[in-house]
């Protein structure tokens, strides 16, 4: 069971995302910057070795603290060497201090088994949670309480938390 959990908690945004175009990640960053133009802190979970959206977001929201997390220590080490504030973290046993004060927590292409954990984490720290699925998979169609967003070809689902600091641009 622990092997399954470890695999489930691993980033799904490592090598598979490297096949996505930079335009795809740019569109994600644009969407987030429109939704959270006054964010003070945003955390991407499961960055892996594909920090493309995060890097774009840093340039769009220069006043915000942009943080990355991943379960893979080597990926986190590489992110830190790139000047990205990154932490080793497991969504199944999150270090809530990493997420405290976040306006938004997001995950690009999360495995379905992580979605309830992401929602729980968002509730605990008072942050909104945004997920960008690989495709319009069936398990995304029945997310009670989540808003479906579509912008410039990007489909996302947003679960609003209790963060009073956000200023939605959409």
PLM region descriptions:
Residues 39-50:
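Conserved class I S-adenosyl-L-methionine
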